[in-house]
Amino acid sequence: MGREGAFLFDQYADGSLSSTKGIYAYWALLTDVLSKERMDAFVAELDNKETFNRLHRVPSLAANHPKYKDNGRYWQGGVWPGANYMVITGLLQQGYRKLAYEIARNHYDNVLKVYKNTGTFWEYYAPEHEEPGFMARPNFVGWGGLAPISGLIEQIFGIRSNVYEKKLTVDVNLTEAYGIDRYPFGLDGLVAIKVKSRSSATQEPQVEITSDVPLELTVLWGDKQKTANVKPGTQTV
């Protein structure tokens, strides 16, 4: 891999570099190969309206590439739920929570609009229209189910768990009330979470949690956080 500015490109057998910007480069988000300075510049490309910040984020091919298609045409710009999940997970791992939420919300909203229009979930989606991708397969709840299930719970509701360390995070971005019931936590645990409505995104959230197992709860909002040790039963953090 090499760089043009801060992007990562495929290297051919002869040592030369491709000039194609594709979503596959963002697997690097799940590694520690880049310095913080380079990572910041690399991630910033996801907000570039000339390349990856399109109507439906994130296209698999940069929009300024000559082979980019507005209907996706599979990997010529198509928005793939699995690839998006990789990008969003990587952004969260690297600490870019705000951008991760923006992309997750954009993807979820577009998938929901297509679902309302067609009655189903699709293999992949068009980057420039609220439509399935060109020749995408319908009723595709393999990776097509990532946005309405994992995307909603982990990225929009912000409920993420580390069962091995007995830790649960609620990353609150919404201002309206929301919650989840019977959230599985490990082999035996069940958790219910209710986040109360807020008047603004900067207001400290109040989270009611009911758990039948002990765990450590961290609540995030903006650049702030609070942590509590939760015992079996119900309490508000």
What are these regions (language model features)?
Residues 30, 85-93, 147-157:
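Short glycine/serine- and small hydrophobic-enriched flexible loop segments
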Residues 32-46, 91-104, 160-164:
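Structural helix-adjacent loops and short alpha-helical linkers that scaffold large soluble proteins
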Residues 137-185:
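Catalytic cores of secreted or luminal carbohydrate-active enzymes
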Residues 176-220:
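Carbohydrate-binding surface patches
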Residues 217-219, 226-237:
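C-terminal beta-strand-rich structural cap/linker in extracellular carbohydrate-active enzymes
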